[in-house]
Amino acid sequence: MTSTKKTIADMHRLTPEAFAAARKVPVVVVLDNVRSQHNVGAVFRTADAFCLQGLCLCGITCCPPNAELHKTALGAEQTVDYTYYPDTTDAIRALHEQGYKVYAIELAHNAVTPEQAIENYCKQPAADRQGVALVLGHEVFGVADEVMAMCDCCIELPQYGTKHSLNVSVTAGIVMYAWAQALRKQTDY
């Protein structure tokens, strides 16, 4: 069988208005002092692609409108909801109060794989699954220690090469996809 590229019409994408009204996958991405505007834009675009609930932009993380962010977001900064917090700990506190399970994505002792975290989350009674927050940190320093201490669990992506880490927007894309796919199987989004 030969594959051919899809046209824009073949993709049946939502309009911005339909996206705003669509039921979102209950995943919020928290960016803890992410310095690269391009990384922030890429996370916006990926959150739009998977119809996630939104973003929390914290500390030095840039907010729209921003020309550099727009270069990678390609307009997703206009469709994906976001909230700015000067301090990431305030974002984590607010998410916990709303019933979210908060996961730091970090290279850490006692971390679990995305698959393990998803399995454990999905085993909980539906009433206890209010949503998931995925915390990604600064490109050099990672998730701040005080933020990690507030998280319910830490997720680490297993890596097998010579480098110590992945780019933050690549990591975000991997975990966002994993959670979106798993939660879509659980409920009709």
Segments the model singles out, each with a brief description of its role:
Residues 1-189:
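Post-transcriptional modification and biogenesis factors for structured RNAs
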